[in-house]
Curated annotation (Swiss-Prot):
Function in brief: Binds directly to 23S rRNA. The L1 stalk is quite mobile in the ribosome, and is involved in E site tRNA release.
One GO BP annotation of this record: translation
Protein name, UniProt field: Large ribosomal subunit protein uL1
Entry-linked Pfam families: Ribosomal_L1 (PF00687)
CDD domains the record matches: Ribosomal_L1
Protein's organism: Leptothrix cholodnii (strain ATCC 51168 / LMG 8142 / SP-6)
Family: Belongs to the universal ribosomal protein uL1 family.
Record GO terms (molecular function): rRNA binding; structural constituent of ribosome; tRNA binding
Subunit and partners: Part of the 50S ribosomal subunit.
InterPro entries, A to Z: Ribosom_uL1_bac-type, Ribosomal_uL1, Ribosomal_uL1-like, Ribosomal_uL1/biogenesis, Ribosomal_uL1_3-a/b-sand, Ribosomal_uL1_CS
Length: 237
C-alpha cells in the first residue's frame, strides 16, 4: 500500500474513518481536500455484492453522465458509406476502415473511444491485441458496436462512462471535476448507481450496493451512506 503524503495525512485527521457521510457532506469534504493546482477529477469506488470470478456475475455497462465528466473525448469510428457520413455529422474525430486500422497498427492511437458498426468488426477484430489492453476494443455490451454509430458518437461526446467490475467486486469511475458544483456531482453519482442497479446480475444475492467511497485525484477517500444517494433516485422515479 502506498504511503500517505503529508497532505493526505492531514486530510485523514479531518475524517471520521468509521462514519458513513451523507452524499452532500462527502462531496463537500472531497472538494475541500482537492487543492491541487489543476482541476482534480472526482472519483468513485463502488463495492458490489457480486463474485466477479463467476461469469454470470460480471457487471459491465455504460452510462451517460447527465452533467458530463469535464473531459473532452476524441472518438474514432470504424465504419463506411452512409454510416461514415453520419458519424462525422455526429462529431466523430476520426472515421475510417482499413486506413484507420493501418494507423492503429502503426501506433497512431490519438483517441479515447472506439466505436464500430457491425460490418466493420472484420477489420477491428484484427486489432484486438492493440486495442484490448488499452480498454479501447468496441463491445456491444457497452454500446460501442452498433449500427447506430451517430447516437454512440453523441453519447461518447456527452460524457458516457464505461464501467466493469474488477476482480475484487469493485467498480471504479469518474463523476466529474472539482469545479463541478455539488448538485452536478451528485447527479452523476446517482446516474452511475442507477446504471449499476439496472445491471445487477440475477444471481447476485444479499446487499448489492455494499459500499461507496468518493475521492479527488490527490485526496483521500470518504465513505458515503448509500441510502443518501439512492433516496435521490427514488425521488426522481
Amino acid at each position: 500500500m502506498a504511503k500517505l503524503t503529508k497532505r493526505q495525512k492531514a486530510q485523514v485527521g479531518k475524517i471520521e474513518t468509521t462514519k458513513l457521510y451523507a452524499v452532500d457532506d462527502a462531496i463537500a469534504l472531497i472538494k475541500e481536500f482537492a487543492v491541487a493546482k489543476f482541476d482534480e477529477s472526482i472519483d468513485v469506488a463502488v463495492q458490489l455484492g457480486v463474485d466477479a470470478k463467476k461469469s454470470d456475475q460480471v457487471v459491465r455497462g455504460a452510462v451517460v453522465m447527465p452533467n458530463g465528466t469535464g473531459k473532452t473525448k476524441r472518438v474514432a469510428v470504424f465504419t463506411q458509406g452512409a454510416k461514415a457520413d453520419e458519424a462525422r455529422a455526429a462529431g466523430a474525430d476520426i472515421v475510417g476502415m482499413d486506413d484507420l486500422a493501418a494507423e492503429v497498427k502503426a501506433g497512431n492511437i490519438n483517441f479515447d473511444v472506439v466505436i464500430a458498426s457491425p460490418d466493420a468488426m472484420r477489420v477491428v477484430g484484427q486489432l484486438g491485441q492493440i486495442l484490448g489492453p488499452r480498454g479501447l476494443m468496441p463491445n456491444p455490451k457497452v454500446g460501442t458496436v452498433t449500427a447506430d454509430v451517430a447516437t454512440a458518437v453523441r453519447n461518447a461526446k456527452a460524457g458516457q462512462v464505461q464501467f466493469r467490475v474488477d476482480k475484487g467486486g469493485i467498480i471504479h469511475g469518474t463523476i466529474g471535476r472539482r469545479s463541478f458544483d455539488t448538485d452536478k456531482l451528485k447527479g452523476n453519482l446517482q446516474a452511475l448507481l442507477d446504471a449499476l442497479n439496472k445491471a445487477k446480475p440475477a444471481s447476485s444475492k444479499g446487499v448489492y450496493l455494499r459500499k461507496v467511497a468518493v475521492s479527488s485525484t490527490m485526496g483521500v477517500g470518504v465513505r458515503v451512506e448509500v441510502a443518501s444517494i439512492t433516496a435521490g433516485l427514488a425521488a426522481q422515479s
